Regions:
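A structural signal for short loop-to-beta-strand junctions that line the ligand-binding cleft
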Residues: 1-12, 140-149
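P-loop NTPase catalytic cores that bind/hydrolyze ATP
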Residues: 41, 155, 168-170
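An extracytoplasmic/periplasmic, membrane-proximal ligand-sensing/linker region
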Residues: 97-110, 115, 125-130, 166-219
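Pocket-lining segment of extracytoplasmic ligand-binding domains
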Residues: 17-21, 62-163
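Extracellular/periplasmic catalytic domains that process cell-envelope and extracellular macromolecules
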Residues: 5-8, 33-35, 108-109, 149-152
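Structured segments of extracytoplasmic/periplasmic soluble domains
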Residues: 30, 34-37, 55-63, 84, ...
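Active-site-proximal beta-strand/loop segments in catalytic clefts of secreted hydrolases
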Residues: 2-4, 43-45, 96-97, 118-119
């Protein structure tokens, strides 16, 4: 890789406000510990949202198999997720998205939702699974009044290990020294931080020698 952190995707866990009002639950860990028959709806198998939902459940101390022994889990398309939550047919959803994602934006504008804060232990467990800490800032969604500490997966620029070192150096330099221009083309790149782009936390593969040289020369 030439570096990571090109994006601002995060894990989002939401209960419907009706579920919170009727049950008193505000924590997924408590729901799982009490084996409450919660109704979860997410994207289909093979999506990052569905995979992240599995990881969240595991991070909260349950296997997916055990979770399904007391809860229900519908995996479907985004339109069905939206209508299912709006109609209170389901209690909860989990996804892995960026700010402004259309389905979540519409859900939060048309239905009262509760933004769930995962506990420190669950977040630490997700970090061991390859996710990186990220903050979902207050105001990201309608009705979200506080920051939510979350976990995201960082986008990387992957190149062949055989790439010429000078080319890798030049590409890394261009990426790190043109952040503003990149952000004008893709808004989420505004979160890219050249100071941390070469860190192990942001990179999902070994740094190319050309990238290493650039980061070492530039602190």
């Amino acid at each position: 890789t030439l570096g990571g952190g090109l994006g601002h995707t995060f894990t989002i866990v939401m209960f419907t406000q009706k579920f919170v009002d009727e049950t008193g639950y505000t924590s997924l860990e408590e729901v799982i510990a009490d084996r409450y028959p919660i109704k979860l709806i997410t994207k289909k198998n093979g999506s990052l949202g569905e995979l992240t939902a599995e990881r969240v459940i595991e991070a909260c101390g349950s296997s997916v198999e055990d979770f399904l022994s007391f809860a229900t889990w519908e995996k479907t398309g985004t339109d069905a997720i939206k209508s299912g939550l709006q109609d209170d047919l389901y209690d909860m959803t989990i996804d892995h998205i960026d700010a402004g994602q259309a389905t979540t934006t519409e859900i939060c504008l048309t239905h009262d939702m509760y933004f769930v804060q995962l506990g420190d232990e669950a977040l630490a467990n997700m970090q061991t699974m390859g996710y990186a800490p990220i903050v979902m800032e207050a105001g990201t969604w309608n009705g979200q009044d506080t920051d939510i500490n979350s976990m995201g997966s960082q986008q990387n620029v992957l190149v062949p290990a055989s790439m010429d070192e000078e080319l890798a150096y030049a590409l890394t330099k261009a990426m790190c020294e043109n952040k503003d221009e990149m952000a004008q083309a893709v808004a989420s790149l505004g979160y890219f931080d050249p100071q941390t782009a070469g860190s192990a936390e942001m990179c999902g593969a070994p740094l190319h020698p050309g990238a290493i040289r650039y980061y070492e020369e530039n602190g």
